[in-house]
Amino acid sequence: MKSQVIAALVGMAVAGGVCGHALAETSLAEEEAHAIGVDAYLYFYPLVTMDVTRKQATNIEPGKVFGRGPMNMFVSVPEYPPASFRDVVRPNYDTLYSIAWIDMTNEPMIVSAPDTHGRYYLLPMLDMWSDVFASPGWRTTGTEAANYLVAPPGWTGSLPNGVIRIDAPTRFVWIIGR
């Protein structure tokens, strides 16, 4: 038993020396490490910002604060945003909104749009990088009633009849309907 412990300790010491030597050969220059840090910041910043926005917008009962409500529920705002509204950078002050955050952690979500009888509407869907990946509405899909299945990454289930599939790049999606 004692010889096995000694052999194990010697083996770890030798392996540690080998690993330490390998790490020393691959160390980064300060400029390269800084560049990697900047790239990581730029890549993850939108994800963090959108997640903070999501948590602030959905951790409340509907109707308590302008445009905010629980996950997986549209909150329709029946009045124009006030000039003091600062939840997003620049909302339109002459537009009525219906806003939803959807969580597809466990399953896809169905989003239904009514027949608007030729009236303009738009349902831009933003991923967690804040990129619009789909925008059902007057210009892209017409104004007749439609059902959309928003599928999370990797979802392979079957599509119900008459439902249009939209693949989301992230499991959380922000819909800013107008």
Regions found by a protein language model. Give the residues of each.
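A compositional/structural signature for long, glycine/proline-rich flexible linkers
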Residues: 23-178
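Positively charged n-region of N-terminal signal peptides that target proteins for export
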Residues: 1-4
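Bacterial N-terminal signal peptides
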Residues: 7-17
